[in-house]
Amino acid sequence: MVKQIMIQGTASDAGKSVLVAGLCRLFKNKGKRVVPFKSQNMSLNSFITATGDEMGRAQVFQAEAAGVFPDVRMNPVLLKPTNDRQSQVIFMGAILDNMDAVTYHDFKQTLIPKIQAVYQSLADENDIIVLEGAGSPAEINLNDRDIVNMGMAKMVDAPVVLVADIDKGGVFASIYGTIMLLNEEERARIKGVIINKFRGDVALLQPGIDMIEELTNVPVIGVIPYANLQLEEEDSVSLSGKNYVPDSNALLDIAIICLPRISNFTDFHILEIQPDISVRYIRNIADFGNPDLVIIPGSKNTLEDMAFLEESGLKNAIQNYAKNAGKVIGICGGYQMLGKKMLDPNQVESKQLEIAGLGLLDTETIFLDQKRTTQITGVTHSGEAVEGYEIHMGETKRGESTSPFCEIKAVNGNEETHQDGAISVNKNIIGTYIHGIFDNDVFLGNLFDELLTGKNKSVYPHEIINLKEHKEQEYDKLAALLEANIQMDQLEKIMKGEKICVSTQKPAIKE
């Protein structure tokens, strides 16, 4: 019979996704067949599986940590906000519909038996499932129809460990408040608490641990030290802490336009881990500066984000930068914005029927009802073999003054040839639909060399850090960190359904 443990949090960005990934790697290293599961994920960071199914990126990196291929069953429901009131609802990798919050709140009850069936299919194939909640279980205005926190725990009778982020402050209030806002049955499901991102001497924390255990009658089974692990961040909350000031000591300054509806910002994790590369996220012209490369990322609402560029003054800043021989790369929605105009006759993305683009590429995009979700391999215009994935609802046509960026050779593992993207005559403006393009070592190394030689400097002096190898190392570090700082004997008892009591054992931080 499958063992299960559910990680819920006192708030968004408490560390749930990373904790689940670490536990998956820890159990994998013990020889267990383990998979992650999150019934419903709201995120604009998504991935396309080998079968063309769309799922949340968090469950992808958790699957990697577990040593298994991403499977859409690990995240059956994906919500992709299109604006502040509406989301695209994706079930088992395919679009169901666009729904406002009230409509979806009523609709999601119909998904419960389907979610249960999906979960059971994973349970039949594995030894352990590590479930992840969303936000906080104490969203009392939504709990009557919850399918991702206590509602999910109840569906499969999973024990819950609550994780709280001490780095933001107010950790004991968040633990107590979360638990006390739950009803009696839900409180009983919380079997342990983990305090995350702790800095300092745990002896100073111990009086608080003793008091919170007495107040809640729930044991604190771990205190995880703050660790500077270089893992993908999925929650858009993390963008608020991203750097916007260039590092004067770096060899290259890369500026990413932080669009209000930015999607798949995980595309840029690979840039952030390379030595001597400054990556910053800019929201206004005051922070624009004089970068060596500007990247316009993907967007869940390209037309509205194009309007943001216009209103913020960033449109003019990018155009002037390009006129002065600046290098600009657009990914997916960013590629669409680089063109002359975008047309939305069926109002797929917004109520605007047409909007002018940046005019840096001789292209036009029309938005279609059908979404393209594929994994691809191909060869770029300069001969680099690349792989990545596409997620878009637009079709872009090139004019005579552009050439294709990439020749696609295979789609979802099947031989299929077509052209992707566009390049300007002077080669400084590039647009592509390929997410993950920077994850290709040779392409990235050549890009860095080009940017540096353009500054009359020598080629990039470091070996490109391979993303897959890097992530494997980070997953192992994470697993070791958790094993050293969680009372694993207590956690395993919880997973077996055994009752554990508030302990007199004092946790000790181990780096």
Swiss-Prot record:
Keywords tagged on the record = Cobalamin biosynthesis, Glutamine amidotransferase
What's a Pfam family in this record?
GATase_3
Q: Which GO terms describe its molecular function?
A: ABC-type vitamin B12 transporter activity; catalytic activity
Q: Which CDD domains match?
A: CobQ_N, GATase1_CobQ
Note the InterPro entries from the entry: Class_I_gatase-like, CobQ/CobB/MinD/ParA_Nub-bd_dom, CobQ_GATase1, CobQ_N, CobQ_synth, GATase_3, P-loop_NTPase
Q: Which SUPFAM superfamilies match?
A: Class I glutamine amidotransferase-like (SSF52317), P-loop containing nucleoside triphosphate hydrolases (SSF52540)
Q: Which GO terms describe its biological process?
A: cobalamin biosynthetic process
The residues covered by the GATase cobBQ-type domain are: 251-443
Q: What does this protein do?
A: Catalyzes amidations at positions B, D, E, and G on adenosylcobyrinic A,C-diamide. NH(2) groups are provided by glutamine, and one molecule of ATP is hydrogenolyzed for each amidation.
Annotated family: Belongs to the CobB/CobQ family. CobQ subfamily.
HAMAP family named among the record's database cross-references: CobQ (MF_00028)
Q: Which NCBIfam families match?
A: cobQ, PRK00784.1
Which protein is depicted?
A: Cobyric acid synthase
Q: What is the lineage of its organism?
A: Bacteria, Bacillati, Bacillota, Bacilli, Bacillales
